[in-house]
Amino acid sequence: MEVLAKHRFARTSPQKCRLVADQIRGLPVAKALEILTFSPKKAAVLVKKVLDSAIANAEHNEGADIDELKVGKVFVDEGPTMKRIMPRAKGRADRIIKRTSHITVVVSDR
């Protein structure tokens, strides 16, 4: 049984978010939650929220036992980028690219 949860358009860059996702892939959910709770990264808060949602989905929709769940898959895809302008000296302007991510967490009982 596999249950997934998604957070789309998360306001963090995929590169930074993948650093956190790689740490919890394949771990039991209790250990993964522990790692995410004490991680100092902003992306850890976002991934933890998605993992909590996936656990709740498994428990409510599938009747799964939380103690047996493992983080099956975690992947972070690139979302749309927002392009902004930053005024600079002498009438010039720089482009600022604000990246977004689509975070997907799949928990399974095997």
From Swiss-Prot:
Any GO molecular function: rRNA binding
PROSITE patterns: RIBOSOMAL_L22 (PS00464)
GO CC entries: cytosolic large ribosomal subunit
GO biological process, one term: translation
Keyword Transmembrane listed: no
Cited InterPro entries: Ribosomal_uL22, Ribosomal_uL22_bac/chlpt-type, Ribosomal_uL22_bac/org-type, Ribosomal_uL22_CS, Ribosomal_uL22_sf
Family classification: Belongs to the universal ribosomal protein uL22 family.
PANTHER family: CHLOROPLAST 50S RIBOSOMAL PROTEIN L22-RELATED, LARGE RIBOSOMAL SUBUNIT PROTEIN UL22M
Designated name of the protein: Large ribosomal subunit protein uL22
UniProt organism field: Shewanella loihica (strain ATCC BAA-1088 / PV-4)
Gene: rplV
